[in-house]
Amino acid sequence: MNKLDSLVKDLPDKELATRFLKQFTERHPSKTEKLQKNEGLLSDALTLASFSPLFATTIIQNPDYLWWLERKRTESRVRNKDELLESLARFALTNSQIEPQILFARFRRRELLRIFLRDIRRLATIAEITEEISNLADAILENSLR
């Protein structure tokens, strides 16, 4: 059994995960090499792709989200609204040429990758996941009303 087979064997949609990796490799060959060297992150990316075609597409379109996820995926606490507002401000600075509604959508999707992964890996309770989604919505709403 090769590495890919062992990583996808317990996923709900092995075919979707495999197709995701093929598409990611075609579009981002150099990033794929880096991803292949980090088995934990590769496993997380395949897991997200297997559970959600939306997240698979998000990662393919925004491969840098993986490296952000690598830094954030070990956090075990709920991020509060103020932390998310700060993170949104940093995201907005690095994406200053994007229309606000697109910026908010991209930020939300990036954060949902992290939150959804915590849920899939059972690193948080349903109450914590719900709280984080609520905090994320509050942060985006507050920022948009400024």
PLM regions and their residue ranges:
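Non-catalytic regulatory/linker segments of enzymes
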Residues: 1-146
